[in-house]
Amino acid sequence: MDQLAHHYRAHIAELNRRVAEILSREALSGLVIHSGQPHRMFLDDINYPFKANPHFKAWLPVLDNPNCWLVVNGRDKPQLIFYRPVDFWHKVSDVPDMFWTEYFDIKLLTKADKVAEFLPTDIANWAYLGEHLDVAEVLGFTSRNPDAVMSYLHYHRTTKTEYELECMRRANQIAVQGHLAAKNAFYNGASEFEIQQHYLSAVGQSENEVPYGNIIALNQNAAILHYTALEHQSPAKRLSFLIDAGASYFGYASDITRTYAFEKNRFDELITAMNKAQLELIDMMRPGVRYPDLHLATHAKVAQMLLDFDLATGDAQGLVDQGITSAFFPHGLGHMLGLQVHDVGGFSHDERGTHIAAPEAHPFLRCTRILAPNQVLTMEPGLYIIDTLLNELKQDSRGQQINWQTVDELRPFGGIRIEDNVIVHQDRNENMTRELGLTD
């Protein structure tokens, strides 16, 4: 933890600086950040898995304890109100004793409904940040998730501190071990369900601890972009494997995708071509580049692949202009990554939250920012055989440019996606995923 502890001091200083600046602009006394509360299932006595408010875990790695609060004003030592009830039914979180605790004035809260006793007396001039607006109202907050504060914090969250970058490297390092285990399980005949167990065991995290529901897709299931079902039986014929899975470290996420062919064939060659294209796109990343331009460059590469692999006829630019590439590559190239998998700030032009919309022809693009140092983004081009989208091409003249025989041959394989997590530096790109061991 020495390196994290070293970086953490500067991380807290930067968060305090941001808070002080926005409080001065908005004439607020401070921010009260709520970790969140348990959500109970309807007509039940069981709670949904708890997920901490990302604004809360930006300050400290308390991820699994509801009813905690942070009181920050950018000047004084931040106060952590740590929930530690007297409870013989459930495990009670230990009093924190890690490198980060020296930066907080820690108060223990034994009853969640007594938190008002720990909050500032002039609460009306403090802003509440969190999900539970009804609780905030009862406590007397008149400013609840104010737009100006949220926009400012979201814009700056895209610029990661050295502490955050190190957490994300470790999240990648953990996920890489899971991907290697999953790949091995695939080639040894495991089912989707069994591959999932191999992955979770390798990363040492439960389904509730990884940052999102893993996509473990064999064969044609790989054509379902957000496939989260897990078949318990192995397919009669093993063709392909797409895995989109990450890991968490101190609240920060990794988000990695790989695709494998079971045998050497045309689909395997298509994976090789996509891998080459993805690395070329990453080489294009640098400060000052518009992320939508990278997305458009991806469509140009997908168009060339459609031609090279006899999936379509015509010229590459025409395939893009007619929307044919969008039927094979319907999602965005990638997104901001950090405390959340689809991290905030991807559409923010400035601190005021001016929104830069995705291009009309590419509505699913999740980032329209100009790249800058210390941003972390995913790069995840893909190519899929999705019948619902391809059927739209059949309805007009575009269908005449598709080689439906090749489509039929590739349909059982589902699709391809290759995704790395990349830090933009001033003079280079750091592909965390590959540099930490997932080279193919």
From Swiss-Prot:
Membrane spanning residue stretches: none
Cofactor annotation comment: Binds 2 manganese ions per subunit.
GO CC terms of this entry: cytosol
Claim: Metal-binding is one of the keywords in the record: yes
SUPFAM superfamilies documented for this protein: Creatinase/aminopeptidase (SSF55920), Creatinase/prolidase N-terminal domain (SSF53092)
Pfam families per record: PepQ_N, Peptidase_M24
Family: Belongs to the peptidase M24B family. Bacterial-type prolidase subfamily.
HAMAP family reported in the protein's UniProt record: X_Pro_dipeptid
Alphabetical list of PANTHER family matching this protein: XAA-PRO AMINOPEPTIDASE 3, XAA-PRO DIPEPTIDASE
UniProt protein name: Xaa-Pro dipeptidase
